[in-house]
Amino acid sequence: MKISKENGITHLDLHGVRHQDVSDEVIDFVFQYQKDIPLMIICGNSNRMIELVEEALNTNCIVFSMPRFGIIRVEKL
């Protein structure tokens, strides 16, 4: 997991994160950086990783979009 800032937007890169850890990592990231929304979550090409991130965000009523396949943008809490 890598957190970086690009063009003023904070990114979470989930490459290398185990599927069982995705939900906790995503929710921790969103709440830790909520003042910086919008946020980007890079899931990569794994459909399962994308599903896990969407599930975690939906469970916590977090509004998001997917501007490109494998990239999720957190819009608001």
Predicted segments — roles?
Residues 1-77:
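Long, charged, low-complexity intrinsically disordered regions
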